[in-house]
Amino acid sequence: MIPSSFKSAEVLEVTKYISEFAAGEGKPYVINMSFGSMVGPHDGKTPYCSSMNDYCKAGGILVAAMGNDGDKKLHTSYEFTEDAQTINLYVKNAKPDGTPYNSYYVDMWNTAADGQQHFSVRPFVYNTANKQKDYKTDDFWKKCGSTVGEIAQYNMKEHYTFSINASVMNGGDSKLIFGIEVTGFKGSSFHAWCNDGGGEFYKPIGSPSAATGDNKYCVGEGAATIPLAIAVGSYNGNNGTFVSLVDSRTYSMSSGSKGAISNFSNIGPYLGDAVKPMIVAPGSVISAGYNSYAADFSKSNVALTAKQKVGLKEYYYGVMSGTSMATPVVTGTIALWLEANPELSPKDIENIFKETARKDGATGFTPTNEKRGYGKIDAYEGLKKAIQYTEVGVNDVFNSETPITLLKQADEWRILFGSNESYADIAVYTTSGRQVLSQYHEDIRRGDEATVSLSGLEPGVYVIKINTTANSTTRKVVVK
């Protein structure tokens, strides 16, 4: 493991290394990316996104976390309905817990990619007590930080950034907040984002014409915005409770109801041409290893849930939440699919999601939506599709040593064949060796499935055995 600053050049260098190593080994690769920000055009057109996307075009698979700002209003947008119309953006000066922001960071982008200036933009200090705007001088804003306007050459969009030191701007007066006045002509429109930790958009009581803050269009820049990257959101796979190792008490870290999209999970849509998020996976209150060498690690942290001693060293586990917990679930699942079919492309993966992702009442039944993309990942159903997505000629290979896959459900075993087989002999035995069930299948095709029902068996321990020409698999089965 090596440290990383996650700067663009460094991420590109590491991706290049992994790509070249995989090519040298003659193997596919999948990269997990759990980082990002709200700074950027969110259209996948930055030079960095284009360079990373080239690896996807060459067959590399990138899996990226959407981000954890779904419960914040980091985005706003506006379309002007008449010429010389003015709209104001207001940025909160404190977090929900009352802690003041140290800085404000706003990134604003025209939707038109025509290389022209459409807006007149002026920063101001707004007094929430007397409802007055103070535009200040250029020298004042230079002391506060930086305000930059440009036409970005890589996407030809008008672009403004504001990076403001909060304490310099307001002098410690909590009544003073940062604002931006935007004037445009009919039909022009923009999107703007506050970077996480750099404020939220809102409308102060009694303030003049204000753009409404929301949580949409928040596909994380730097990873999830890469056009062919698989952007991952989080849903709640449990009820949010856990028992602490520290005091054996039950705690709740709920991110919403079980089965729903986690309230922290960033949502789309994406301003480029892709479905983002593309898929969601469990990411709320997930048990994982804790780094005891981290500066903020504490043995008294109630989120710790288990420890294991190996020699003289103690290893700790605890619960964490975030799309960075959901993303490795997807990355690992795709790695499993690549074992079954190393030729899968990023587009193949998307098609598998489209065909197999689960939809339910908690997240809706439409083909896609801005919160969960195609739906909840189904590793097993996706594996079946991955096996079926084989190149012409594979179907002529019989009796491979590719292992079968077994999925245990409440009252049955589902057996998935990873290769063509001339036959399969399936039998279930008691621990004393008495055969209680048997099946025989011929001319099995890659991706075929057999189901063994256990519903008629008495409670106890059984052994299931599957024989093919080149492979024999045995598993214990507990029937309750």
Q: What does each model-identified segment do?
A:
Residues 1-8, 12, 16-24, 105-113, ...:
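Hydrolase catalytic cores
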Residues 3, 19-42, 65, 181-185, ...:
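Short acidic, glycine-rich surface-loop motifs adjacent to enzyme active sites
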Residues 37-60, 64-260, 288-323:
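Substrate-binding/specificity loop regions of serine endopeptidase catalytic domains
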Residues 112-116, 283, 419-423:
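Short proline/glycine-enriched turn/loop motifs at strand-loop junctions of beta-rich domains
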Residues 28-37, 41-44, 55, 59-66, ...:
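C-terminal subdomain of the subtilisin-like protease fold in secreted/lumenal serine endopeptidases
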Residues 23-25, 55-57, 222-227, 270-274, ...:
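Extracellular/periplasmic catalytic domains that process cell-envelope and extracellular macromolecules
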Residues 397-480:
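C-terminal outer-membrane/trafficking sorting elements
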